[in-house]
Each structure stands twice: as structure tokens, then as C-alpha cells.
Amino acid sequence: MKKITMIKMEGCPYCAAAFQAIDEIKKNYPPTELEVIDENFQPQLAEKFTDYYYVPSMYVDGKKIYEAHPGESYDECFASVKKVFEAAR
């Protein structure tokens, strides 16, 4: 599996939903490296990713696959996170 990078912020409800989806989805996929970057605490790492506005944003080998949007439902988040894992295969 390819490396997945997730950019998040502490206290973000959409990030919490993404982590819940990851916990459910990863059971059905081979182990993969998941790098989590907190935008507030690791700005030097987050600034390498210049093509996102909302968090969470998820990348596979540096290519953005998912970016949350305001008002996103858990089902939308789950489907998007699943696409990330599919892209990492």
C-alpha cells in the first residue's frame, strides 16, 4: 500500500469523523502507513501541501484524494476516506 497523509486540526469535528471512518475501513485493507500532520502543531510539515483549504485533507503519495467541506455528513466522509484507501492500494 502507498503512504496516506492526513492533515488535521485539533478539535475539528470533521477530522474526528475521518478518524472514525479510518478505524472502520482499515480493517478491510492491508496495513498502510498513515502519517497524520496537525496543521497547528506541525505547520512546517503542513505547508508542504499547498492545495487544500479545509481539514481533514488526505493525500496518497502527495496527491490530494480527499478534502472535507463544511456541512459534510458522516456518510460522505466515510465514502471519501474509502476512496483514499482504494487509491493507496
Describe each region flagged by the PLM.
Residues 1-28:
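Local sequence-structure signature of Cys/Sec-based thiol-disulfide redox active-site neighborhoods
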Residues 4-6, 34, 58-60, 81:
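Hydrophobic beta-strand residues in large extracellular and virion-surface proteins
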Residues 13-14, 41, 72:
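Short alpha-helical
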Residues 27-30, 50:
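Proline-centered flexible-loop/turn and helix-kink motifs
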Residues 31-44:
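Thiol-based oxidoreductase modules, predominantly thioredoxin-like and allied folds used
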Residues 47-49, 71:
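Short aromatic-enriched loop/helix-cap "lid" or pocket-rim segments at secondary-structure transitions
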Residues 49-60:
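Structural micro-motif
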Residues 60-89:
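Non-catalytic, surface beta->alpha helical segment in thiol-disulfide oxidoreductase systems
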